[in-house]
Design a protein with these regions (language model features):
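N-terminal transmembrane-helix/juxtamembrane module of multi-pass inner/ER membrane proteins
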Residues: 2-52, 71-146
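Membrane-interfacial alpha-helical segments at the cytosolic side of multi-pass membrane proteins
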Residues: 148-152, 250-268, 298-307
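Membrane-interfacial catalytic/cofactor-binding modules of polytopic membrane enzymes
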Residues: 180-262
């Protein structure tokens, strides 16, 4: 397999599709910040961050023209994808000003299932042999993204830009939902209302409680497990009381599995066990209500189709000539 990573190539000028959609999301959320300026916690810093991201994007475009090759193209796209770790907690800065809706979703969950599956699951299976595989699956989320993207880069470079665009666009669609649908999930909501209320099926509204309280208590499972502690550490760093409905972990991993299936059945087969564990883990570690995960799965197909259509309709151009 001749990669020719550093071989100079003829390339089109301008922004890649994934950079364009990032700038569009950047602009849309900047406008939203201006509308909500008086209510937001640190709007000036958020706007400054967006200016830096836009400036960095155009700088990378310029530097790429000095040495256009597959590797520098990968770097440009990888940087945009890495910014998802910024855009995700950024959604909380918007939805923290809206009344929390967890009481609605917990009540629907109670009505549909006669209780809380997120509580049942971890209470019935607290042992290491259940906890560790599920936490491993949950932690595998970002490696799964990396594996699919790198596979397309190495083996189907002609589809690399499309795949990266669809992934980032799908994330942005979920993020826009999270901005306007403030649901934190059981891991934040249940400690806030107390276990007695949960056991009795009473789910009070907590208003803007998470505007001032973002503490995340240790989750359920085998507390001495290696993967349990990996998940706990990553959540303490990057998790916020946001993004529960629908589950982007389930939704995006489903999008990735669609891409894996279309690209390589062997890749799909290798990822499938981790995918199943990841989906189960969203409820097991109480990151999501079961309805979040179900809607995440169903929504993935529509979002994949929409993002693919957007690429073909407005953004499709060959990266290299």
């Amino acid at each position: 397999m001749a990669l020719d990573l550093f071989k100079r190539v003829e390339t089109r000028k301008g922004l890649f599709a994934v950079e364009k959609i990032t700038l569009i999301y950047n602009l849309l959320t900047s406008i939203l910040i201006l509308f909500l300026f008086q209510e937001m916690d640190h709007p000036v810093q958020m706007l400054a961050d967006r200016v830096v991201i836009a400036g960095m994007t155009f700088l990378l475009m310029y530097l790429y023209r000095l040495a256009p090759c597959k590797f520098s193209a990968f770097v440009r796209i990888a940087i945009q994808m890495s910014l998802l770790s910024y855009w995700y907690p950024d959604t909380f800065e918007f939805n923290r000003i809206f009344p929390n809706l967890d009481h609605v979703f917990a009540s629907v969950e109670q009505w549909m299932f006669g209780g809380q599956p997120a509580v049942w699951f971890c209470e019935r299976f607290p042992k290491m042999w259940v906890s560790e595989p599920f936490n491993m699956g949950y932690f595998f989320y970002y490696p799964m993204i990396l594996l699919v993207v790198v596979w397309y880069f190495l083996y189907r470079f002609d589809l690399f830009e499309k795949v990266s665009f669809v992934i980032v666009t799908a994330f942005f669609i979920y993020y826009l939902i999270y901005i306007f649908v403030p649901v934190a999930g059981p891991q934040f909501y249940f400690p806030a209302i107390g276990s007695d209320h949960v056991a009795q099926g009473i789910f009070p509204s907590i208003g803007d409680y998470f505007h001032h309280h973002q503490e995340l208590l240790p989750g359920p499972g085998y507390e001495h497990g290696f993967f349990y502690n990996l998940v706990e550490s990553s959540q303490q760093v990057g998790e916020r009381p946001t993004a529960a409905f629908p589950s982007s972990h389930v939704g995006m991993s489903t999008v990735l599995m669609i891409m894996a299936w279309r690209g390589s059945k062997r890749l799909f087969a290798c990822l499938f066990p981790f995918y199943l564990l990841l989906c189960g883990a969203t409820v097991y570690i109480q990151a999501h209500y079961l309805i979040d995960s179900i809607v995440g799965f169903v929504s993935a197909f529509g979002i994949y189709i929409l993002a693919t259509w957007m690429f073909k309709r407005w953004f499709a151009q060959p990266m290299l000539r």
